[in-house]
């Protein structure tokens, strides 16, 4: 869902882009998407750190379920 936001920028650059009918929202949206894509995995890791540690402890104590199927 798109939401209206306010962005501060250089007035001269804004006027030039506006004069050439450049889609300023598109210019801003792409870097925001890229940054959000970079931050989501970091947030997930922090939120799930305790669960991942518990899985690691379980595997350390009991081994992996796939260990018996390994051919190497």
Curated annotation (Swiss-Prot):
Gene3D superfamilies: 1.10.1220.80. This is Antitoxin CcdA. Belongs to the CcdA antitoxin family. It comes from the Bacteria. InterPro entries: Post-segregation_anti-tox_CcdA (IPR009956). Homodimer in solution and when bound to DNA. Forms a complex with toxin CcdB; the CcdA-CcdB(2) trimer is sufficient for rejuvenation, whereas maximal operon repression occurs with CcdA(2)CcdB(2). It comes from Escherichia coli. Coiled coil: none annotated. The gene is ccdA. Antitoxin component of a type II toxin-antitoxin (TA) system which inhibits the post-segregational killing (PSK) of plasmid-free cells, also referred to as a plasmid addiction system. Binds to and blocks the activity of CcdB; will also remove bound CcdB protein from the CcdB-GyrA complex by forming a CcdA-CcdB complex, a process termed rejuvenation. Functions as a transcriptional corepressor for the ccdAB operon, repression also requires CcdB. It holds the Pfam family CcdA. Keywords: DNA-binding, Plasmid, Repressor, Toxin-antitoxin system, Transcription, Transcription regulation. GO terms for molecular function: DNA binding.
């Amino acid at each position: 869902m798109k939401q209206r936001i306010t962005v501060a920028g250089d007035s001269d650059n804004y006027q030039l882009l506006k004069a050439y009918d450049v889609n300023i929202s598109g210019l801003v949206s792409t870097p925001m998407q890229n940054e959000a894509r970079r931050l989501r995995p970091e947030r997930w890791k922090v939120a799930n750190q305790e669960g991942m540690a518990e899985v690691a402890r379980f595997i350390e104590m009991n081994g992996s379920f796939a260990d018996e199927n390994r051919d190497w």
